[in-house]
Amino acid sequence: MQAKINSFFKPSSSSSIAASVTTDTDDGLAVWENNRNAIVNTYQRRSAITERSEVLKGCIEKTLKKGSSSVPKNHKKKRNYTQFHLELGQSDFLLRHCAECGAKYAPGDELDEKNHQSFHKDYMYGLPFKGWQNEKAFTSPLFIKNRIVMVSENDSPAHRNKVQEVVKMMEVELGEDWILHQHCKVYLFISSQRISGCLVAEPIKEAFKLIASPDDERQLQKESSSSPSTSIQFGNIVLQREVSKRCRTSDDRLDNGVIVCEEEAKPAVCGIRAIWVSPSNRRKGIATWLLDTTRESFCNNGCMLEKSQLAFSQPSSIGRSFGSKYFGTCSFLLYKAQLIDTHFS
């Protein structure tokens, strides 16, 4: 049988072995060359939604970075829930006037209302006072657990500074910048750890007698005879009774506001520049005890002053009514308090 044509081109065994070796070598070299220049992808394809969100986030970040230099950052702020009020023609819309303490405050303002409450309490009941170690104190059986403390120009700065606080409270009713000076003696009434009363006294040499009308004297005698005693004594124990009294115009005013004095001066030793008691403690005998203590301790020699040696500065209608009851006559001594430019502190 005739051989096929392929048989004529079939290499020998030796040549075939060599060719196979050469072919294997050439194939390994080709594989090495292909692997050296190949880029192998080792990541997995992400979802289309994730890719879009990442691209969008990157665009937003680039936009914010570009505008950060010109546009300030918007920090989140806490909401302020402010109480608003409607203006409907109220007379006290902006500021409200307290009829008891006289202070003005803005209703709805938390800080303003808090300050008013603090001032109102101090004015009505007295300034807080814890006491001092070295006190010139006076006591009375009529006022159990209460005392009067005297402060003078030679006392410590802490004592004098406290007096200045009390005087500021007194100025609400009595006016500013005239009550206190360096040569005054101050008497503080202490009750329930509060300063509820204050008397300011100064040395004087003369005063003038007040001229009172006969009608004022008759009115005073009528009130003195009709008023019951406020103290009850059981042996050595004295009880003070509180009296609730209606504040009528005739009780606080014995004249028409005009003060006329005699031209001839009378000798006097102690001038009462100002006397004040907190509103919640009035009509309890505190002002009377302050005056009695002043008479006992004002002079350095220890002698007690007579009532006729005391004089009031220009009193108000309420002060004149109190002075008439204390002295037992409407014709007591008055003097003009001078403005002395020397500070107490």
From Swiss-Prot:
Source organism, top-level taxon: Eukaryota
Chief site of localization: nucleus
PTM characteristics: Autoacetylated.
Tissue expression summary: Expressed in roots, stems, leaves, young seedlings and flower buds. Detected in the embryo, but not in the endosperm.
The keyword Amino-acid biosynthesis appears for this protein: no
GO MF term list: acetyltransferase activity; zinc ion binding
Keyword Acyltransferase: yes
Compartment annotation: Nucleus; Cytoplasm
GO process annotations (BP): anther development; cell division; developmental vegetative growth; DNA repair; double-strand break repair via homologous recombination; embryo development ending in seed dormancy; embryo sac development; establishment of meiotic sister chromatid cohesion
E.C. number: 2.3.1.-
Enzyme class: transferase
Keywords attached to this entry: Acetylation, Acyltransferase, Cell cycle, Cell division, Cytoplasm, Meiosis, Metal-binding, Mitosis, Nucleus, Transferase, Zinc, Zinc-finger
Spans traversing the lipid bilayer: none
Function: Acetyltransferase required for the establishment of sister chromatid cohesion. Involved in preservation of genome integrity and meiosis. Required for DNA repair and for the regulation of chromosome segregation during mitotic cell division. Knock-down mutants are extremely dwarf. Regulator of sister chromatid cohesion in meiosis which negatively regulates cohesin association with chromatin, acting as an antagonist of WAPL1 and WAPL2.
Protein name: Protein CHROMOSOME TRANSMISSION FIDELITY 7
Upper taxonomic lineage: Eukaryota, Viridiplantae, Streptophyta, Embryophyta, Tracheophyta
